[in-house]
Amino acid sequence: MGDAIRIIGIDPGLRRTGWGIVESLGNSLRFVASGTVRSEDKAALATRLCQLHDGLAEVLHAAMPHEAAVEQTFVNKDAVATLKLGQARGIAMLVPARAGLVVAEYAPNAVKKAVIGVGHGDKKQIHMMVKVLLPKATFDTEHAADALAIAICHAHHRQSAAYRMALAG
């Protein structure tokens, strides 16, 4: 059947970036770890981005995932906040890419559909289903729970023929 694939899901945020790691073997999923990388609210933007970078790099070095998945950001009315979130997302994509991992991206509604079966649902439903799908899962913040949902989404999507074709070519 092959070896288990270790997947890190990343929920980017400037204050808190959640991460969650699962192992996928066939149709089964196993919880590995989760957590949250925090940046100092009062620090300069560049310093905060460095804190996110260093924290995620430490997680990747320790956990040795094979693939990564990052949630796409939404655009809101506050352009400055959206730009800062985009910069944090850039760090969330850069760190695994620099480690040589393929980085997949998923829209929030795709994550919800993969985890709860519909593209629109609230955080409570998502977190409940994460616990159903990964009974041993623990998470310190909602960001870590969201990151586990992103990893679950990637585990489901990587089984598709279209995903395998994209990797091959």
Curated annotation (Swiss-Prot):
Binding residues for Mg(2+) 2: E71
Cofactor binding note from Swiss-Prot or TrEMBL: Binds 2 Mg(2+) ion per subunit.
Predominant place of localization: cytoplasm
UniProt keyword Ribonucleoprotein, yes or no: no
Domain of life: Bacteria
Biological process, per Gene Ontology: DNA recombination; DNA repair
This enzyme's EC code(s): 3.1.21.10
Pfam families hit by this protein: RuvC
InterPro entries: RNaseH-like_sf, RNaseH_sf, X-over_junc_endoDNase_RuvC
Enzyme class: hydrolase
Record's keyword annotation contains Hydrolase: yes
CDD domains (UniProt xref): RuvC
Reaction equation(s) it catalyzes: Endonucleolytic cleavage at a junction such as a reciprocal single-stranded crossover between two homologous DNA duplexes (Holliday junction)
Active site residues per record: D11, E71, H143
GO cellular component: cytoplasm; Holliday junction resolvase complex
Keywords: Cytoplasm, DNA damage, DNA recombination, DNA repair, DNA-binding, Endonuclease, Hydrolase, Magnesium, Metal-binding, Nuclease
Necessary cofactors: Mg(2+)
Cited function: The RuvA-RuvB-RuvC complex processes Holliday junction (HJ) DNA during genetic recombination and DNA repair. Endonuclease that resolves HJ intermediates. Cleaves cruciform DNA by making single-stranded nicks across the HJ at symmetrical positions within the homologous arms, yielding a 5'-phosphate and a 3'-hydroxyl group; requires a central core of homology in the junction. The consensus cleavage sequence is 5'-(A/T)TT(C/G)-3'. Cleavage occurs on the 3'-side of the TT dinucleotide at the point of strand exchange.
Family, as annotated: Belongs to the RuvC family.
NCBIfam families on file: ruvC (TIGR00228)
Annotated protein name in UniProt: Crossover junction endodeoxyribonuclease RuvC
Organismal lineage: Bacteria, Pseudomonadati, Pseudomonadota, Alphaproteobacteria, Hyphomicrobiales
